[in-house]
Amino acid sequence: HLDSAAGVAGFIKTVLSLHHRTLVPTVHFTTPSPRIDWDSSPFYVNAETRAWETDRLPLRAGVSAFGIGGTNAHVVLEEAPPRVHGQSDSGPRVVPLSARSPEALRAAVRRLADHLEAHPGLPLDDVAGTLQLGREAFRHRAALVASDTGEARELLAAGDPTHLVIGDAGEPVDGYVFLFPGGGAQYLGMARDLHRRYPAFRQEVDRGLDLLREREGVDLRPIWFAEPDDAAANDAFQRPSVQLPALFILEMGLARHLMRWGFEPTALIGHSLGENTAACLAGVVNYEDALGLVALRGRLFDDAAPGGMLSVTADPDTVRARLGPTLDLAAVNGPEQCTVSGPREAIDALAAKLDSEGIDARVVPIDIAAHSSLVEPLLEPFEAYLRSLELHPPQIPFLSNRTGTWITDDEATDPAYWAAHL
């Protein structure tokens, strides 16, 4: 008798029988008991090895355990579904390892290299997935990025620190903060590889692209995924009605993708347009309405007086002292990081002046003067659209561009706040 482990042997035997789809004979069985009316019963004692077949799939079996202390238990087992070897997306995979000591970690690296050497046909997806999800993470860790099993084996065997990163785990983080950029961060082909390799990310991005085409009549695909040397596409990507929806769709796609991987944000912050993305992710406005808002923002900027923006590495007082009457200090992004907005000629003149003084200043690749007096005529139609939307208190806290502190429920649900945000 297995005492408190009663039933374990039968459990293991039954799991193996299901796996091999084979019924094995009962140990030491010779003659059925005459005290049981076998002929009137559906039960029998199996006395020979035979295939376990049935038309009623899946196979199931019951295992009873009668503990020596009087415990009675019954477990019903069912065969696992057939393993499907689908065609996974090509691309790099993270292969992690961990151990309780540096010596054990080095041994784990060697064992994995030997295992991949002995089983070259193993899909890297399976190897990476098992190590990511099926192993406890200890303090001493190693990780590499590889595109196939052969490359992973070579990197493990070589132990090159430029490819095999080894170190100790830091203290657990309390959470993650997602940061969303604003207009000017766009470039042709952004996230093209992610779009090709990850179906869930592609589905999220395509959802936004399809919605924009259906509701606004704007098809971003030929522009977004154009080659970097496509001059016409580059010019088109400077238009606010093109770049702003593209950035919003990408930012939401990346955020959702990270959240699927387990990176749940505990706080958000967005720069300019990025605060619209933060509001959407925080639940202030739904996806469809947020995309419509961003599309309107882009159209209004298209029709606004032409202008530009300048990113300046200097403190606010230094920047203010150099502003002419037509320029505005649009944003104070940090102690020595400011953004200036205004007419293009004045922006170019200020950039030249700052360069002559040795102050770093870079023109933002956008053809509008956001957050300046030039956008005041846009506020009324923008706020009118906002008043047609249903706004909710944020479910994830995010920082306000306008106050520099956490946005309040009243601010987040006030159309006037978002109109002044322009």
Identify what each model region corresponds to.
Residues 1-44, 66, 88-96, 103-106, ...:
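Acyl-CoA/ACP chain-elongation machinery
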Residues 8-16, 46, 74, 78, ...:
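Predominant activation on well-ordered alpha-helical scaffold segments within soluble catalytic domains
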Residues 99, 166-322, 333, 360-369, ...:
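FabD-like malonyl-/acyl-CoA
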Residues 1, 137, 304, 311, ...:
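Acyltransferase
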Residues 23, 28, 43, 85-92, ...:
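Short acidic (Asp/Glu) and glycine-rich catalytic loops that position anionic groups and cofactors
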Residues 10-16, 64, 142-144, 178, ...:
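Conserved, well-structured core segments
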Residues 36, 44, 54, 59-176, ...:
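Flexible catalytic loop/linker elements that gate and position reactive groups at enzyme active sites
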Residues 5-9, 99-110, 121, 146-150, ...:
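Electropositive phosphate-/nucleotide-binding environments in soluble metabolic enzymes
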